[in-house]
């Protein structure tokens, strides 16, 4: 059994990768989010990312990366390998972004870390169907308004929404999984969650060509009691 960390954004692809890693028998020891100094993620708010890790019962590591970023990543990964006795890294990457090679694979190679990419170049339709089959609840946390209307922000990726999204992607020629930045998601429930999270009061904000969910000042995403969960889940 190999010891691995999962590179965690909090989105649907990271959650699917988590499911596949456990299914493959890897020992998942922590979730790691790489970030620049003083990070502010519009698509993946850090307070919610931390709550996800709490719900999953896993340590969350916020790893600061300094420039030059190639060397910064390698130094950070080397520290993680030593501190956590790692054999490998799991990512939710589906494809190259903008034609660029797989960044993490290049950074891990000189360190002797195996990179597991269970979603790599899979059918988008199959991946979205797998998300539903595993009862992963994901919401569009950020959309590129040049591709999707701002009203998509905050929508839950349920069966009906996915049909609409895939039809639109086929017609307009964009990636149905959002791999090229068309949209981002945040997961509020799924396999391993002690209880669902909810996004009460979150609002849609705008910045340049992005529409994104923002947390009300002074509030945190709350966990719903397992007794009030809409479905039973095997843990």
Locate predicted features.
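ATP-dependent adenylation/nucleotidyltransferase module used to activate substrates
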Residues: 1-142, 171, 230-231
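ATP/NTP-dependent adenylation/nucleotidyl-transfer catalytic domains that generate, transfer
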Residues: 2-3, 58, 87-90, 103-104, ...
């Amino acid at each position: 059994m190999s010891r691995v960390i999962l590179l965690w954004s909090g989105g649907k692809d990271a959650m699917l990768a988590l499911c596949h890693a456990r299914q493959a028998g890897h020992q998942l020891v922590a979730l790691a989010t790489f970030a620049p100094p003083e990070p502010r993620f519009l698509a993946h708010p850090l307070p919610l990312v931390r709550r996800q890790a709490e719900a999953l019962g896993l340590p969350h590591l916020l790893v600061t990366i300094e420039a030059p970023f190639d060397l910064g990543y390698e130094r950070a990964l080397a520290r993680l390998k030593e501190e956590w006795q790692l054999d490998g890294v799991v990512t939710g990457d589906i494809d190259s972004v903008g034609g660029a090679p797989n960044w993490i694979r290049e950074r891990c190679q000189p360190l002797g870390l195996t990179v597991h990419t269970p979603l790599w170049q899979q059918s988008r339709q199959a991946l979205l169907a797998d998300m539903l089959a595993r009862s992963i609840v994901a919401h569009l946390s950020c959309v590129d308004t040049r591709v999707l209307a701002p009203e998509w922000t905050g929508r839950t990726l349920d069966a009906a929404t996915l049909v609409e999204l895939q039809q639109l992607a086929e017609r307009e020629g964009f990636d149905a999984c959002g791999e090229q930045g068309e949209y981002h998601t945040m997961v509020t429930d799924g396999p391993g969650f002690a209880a669902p999270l909810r996004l009460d009061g979150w609002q849609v904000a705008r910045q340049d060509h992005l529409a994104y969910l923002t947390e009300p000042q002074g509030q945190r995403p709350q966990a719903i009691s397992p007794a009030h969960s809409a479905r039973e889940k095997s843990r």
